[in-house]
């Protein structure tokens, strides 16, 4: 039986396709944010053309620089808004949250849909059983112009997870463990397909898994729907990797590689100056709730640690506020930033200085990712981040939490 990716793309192309073939595909969704959108618009101008083939498919989301971090950022966004008006692009989301969160929340990404997005973490939509691919802004200019792009039909690497996670291990620890075992380029131009335990996980946890698939080189990621048609169930896979969830422990990606993954106990005692909770990886309501509860349990943050919490979307912020989490965090001295990418890309709202050591719930820890190239970033779960925020250093949650 063909893989899920082969079946979905065959339906789009109108004839059977196999992994390795190069085909032109018309997606259901063409997503741009304020970064890739600006690049796409500049490319169209350089080509001397300005046309949008399928405006009804275009989704424009401002998330990288919200609110605008500079005059240049404000001008880029204003130009994109004017472009959207000229071409009758109606799906415009300004200051509503991270693009990948909004795509899922607003139902743009859904079972069997094909999403082309101008961001490398577009595979996050695979959590909603969409087949989602990330492209650069230049490629996305041609998606606007022609309503299609060529792709190579990806092979399928299945990660089958048996058993259950044992607290305090989380989906983030599972995701980092997979990246650590596979390595940064292992799944190059593959669909990383999760089966077993991930099929029973919450949507937020599935988004975390699919989001980090990019860091193993995956072109796309996919979790089968809990209930759905047979054509969206797993088929053939080029490779199957099996993991036991009960063996997963709290881990961190140490500077400066996402795939350099180690148990938290191996780096115990590293002093921390910053903690960032948010991003398209771990900025959802449950992430913030768990972080807040643990921070309260451990009597609040260490006095030498500065904390920024960035909700992944306006809906997340609303729910945080309704549940009383926002006020609790503020009273503990935590900075709450507007929904969006925040300091994840090192542009504003909490960038790191030369000597900062940050525990981040995001997805990348390259030199300069969050500010100074001399800063160090440890990627971790909200649980590990909360313990570090309270202790002022990296501590294995298994040693602290009952």
From Swiss-Prot:
Family annotation (Pfam families): Aconitase (PF00330)
Pathway(s) this gene product operates in, as recorded in its UniProt entry: Amino-acid biosynthesis; L-leucine biosynthesis; L-leucine from 3-methyl-2-oxobutanoate: step 2/4
Cofactor(s) recorded in Swiss-Prot or TrEMBL: [4Fe-4S] cluster
PROSITE patterns: ACONITASE_1, ACONITASE_2
Protein role: Catalyzes the isomerization between 2-isopropylmalate and 3-isopropylmalate, via the formation of 2-isopropylmaleate.
Protein family per UniProt: Belongs to the aconitase/IPM isomerase family. LeuC type 2 subfamily.
Name of the molecule in the record: 3-isopropylmalate dehydratase large subunit 2
Gene name for this UniProt entry: leuC2
């Amino acid at each position: 039986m063909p893989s899920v990716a082969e079946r979905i793309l065959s339906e789009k192309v109108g004839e059977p396709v196999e992994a390795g073939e190069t085909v032109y595909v018309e997606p259901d969704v063409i997503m741009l944010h304020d970064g890739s959108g600006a690049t796409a618009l500049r490319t169209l101008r350089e080509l001397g053309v300005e046309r949008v083939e399928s405006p009804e498919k275009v989704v424009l989301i401002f998330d990288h620089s919200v609110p605008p971090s500079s005059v240049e950022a404000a001008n880029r966004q204003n130009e994109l808004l004017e472009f959207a008006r000229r071409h009758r692009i109606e799906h415009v989301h300004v200051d509503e949250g991270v693009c990948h969160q909004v795509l899922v929340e607003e139902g743009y990404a859904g079972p069997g849909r094909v999403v082309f997005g101008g961001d490398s973490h577009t595979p996050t939509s695979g959590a909603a059983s969409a087949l989602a691919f990330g492209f650069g802004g230049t490629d996305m200019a041609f998606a606007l112009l022609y309503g299609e792009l060529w792709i190579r039909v990806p092979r399928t690497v299945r990660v089958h997870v048996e058993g259950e996670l044992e607290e305090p291990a989380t989906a983030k620890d599972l995701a980092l463990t997979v990246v650590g075992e596979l390595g940064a380029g292992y799944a190059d131009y593959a669909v990383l397909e999760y089966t077993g335990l991930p099929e029973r996980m919450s949507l937020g946890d599935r988004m975390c898994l699919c989001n980090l698939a990019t860091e193993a080189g995956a072109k796309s990621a996919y979790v089968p729907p809990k209930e759905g048609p047979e054509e969206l169930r797993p088929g053939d896979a080029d490779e199957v990797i099996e993991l036991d969830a009960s063996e997963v422990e709290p881990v961190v990606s140490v500077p400066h590689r996402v795939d350099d993954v180690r148990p938290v106990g191996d780096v115990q005692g590293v002093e921390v100056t910053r903690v960032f909770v948010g991003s398209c990886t771990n900025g959802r309501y449950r992430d913030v709730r768990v972080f807040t509860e643990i921070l309260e349990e451990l009597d609040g943050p260490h006095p030498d640690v500065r904390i920024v919490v960035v909700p992944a979307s306006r809906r997340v912020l609303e729910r945080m506020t309704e549940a009383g989490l926002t006020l609790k965090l503020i009273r503990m001295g935590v900075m709450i930033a507007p929904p969006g990418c925040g300091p994840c890309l090192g542009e504003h709202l909490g960038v790191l200085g030369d000597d900062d050591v940050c525990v981040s719930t995001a997805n990348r820890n390259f030199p300069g990712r969050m500010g100074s190239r001399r800063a160090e970033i440890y990627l971790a779960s909200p649980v590990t981040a909360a313990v570090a925020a309270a202790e002022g250093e990296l501590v294995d949650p298994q040693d602290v939490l009952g």
